[in-house]
């Protein structure tokens, strides 16, 4: 992911003004800057429902702690059934805004080939569906994935769940049916080779 888009700057500023951003800084994480490539374990702006039910921007670390390292993704098809994700699926959903996401071409001969930047065909920002939970009093998230659209199967067999902007509130609201909201996800992407 690369939040270098000017549209993201205000979201990042809002995140960095929060009390949670101060807590992350005290724990050795730096607040996000609105440019550059983003990697797992980074603190990113995530949109979620507050305790009072309002849409808010929170800093969240990318990755659930797992026995073998960070879990950065969850399969949308099985998240509701998996113990690791079940509660978050039902009650703690978030959206991660980004300009692009990156993928590497994979083939049978080598682990990774060329790097590509992808985004929805007709959308500006990407609204990635995520799940979050608390670890050591700080929020952490995973990104939901789904089978890749036929147009990018040559690159990778999975892709993130990307929501239309008008479905963000529906996704983050506890009590709504997440499986139904995912049916509206965007699948057609445009891509270009990244440097």
What is each residue range found by the language model?
Residues 1-195:
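Short linear sequence motif anchored by a di-proline
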């Amino acid at each position: 992911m690369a939040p270098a888009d000017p549209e993201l700057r205000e979201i990042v500023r809002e995140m960095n003004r929060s009390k949670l951003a101060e807590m992350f800084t005290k724990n050795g994480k730096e607040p996000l800057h609105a440019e550059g490539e983003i990697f797992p374990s980074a603190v990113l702006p995530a949109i979620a429902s507050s305790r009072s039910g309002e849409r808010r921007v929170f800093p969240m670390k990318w990755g659930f702690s797992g026995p073998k390292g960070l879990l950065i993704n969850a399969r949308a098809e099985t998240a509701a059934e998996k113990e690791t994700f079940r509660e978050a699926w039902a009650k703690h959903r978030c959206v991660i805004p980004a300009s692009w996401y990156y993928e590497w071409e994979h083939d049978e001969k080598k682990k990774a080939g060329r790097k590509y930047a992808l985004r929805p065909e007709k959308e500006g920002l990407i609204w990635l569906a995520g799940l979050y939970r608390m670890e050591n009093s700080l929020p952490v998230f995973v990104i939901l994935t789904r089978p890749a659209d036929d147009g990018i199967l040559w690159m990778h067999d999975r892709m993130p769940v990307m929501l239309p902007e008008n479905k963000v509130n529906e996704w983050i609201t506890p009590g709504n049916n997440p499986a139904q909201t995912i049916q509206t996800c965007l699948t057609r992407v445009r891509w270009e080779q990244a440097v």
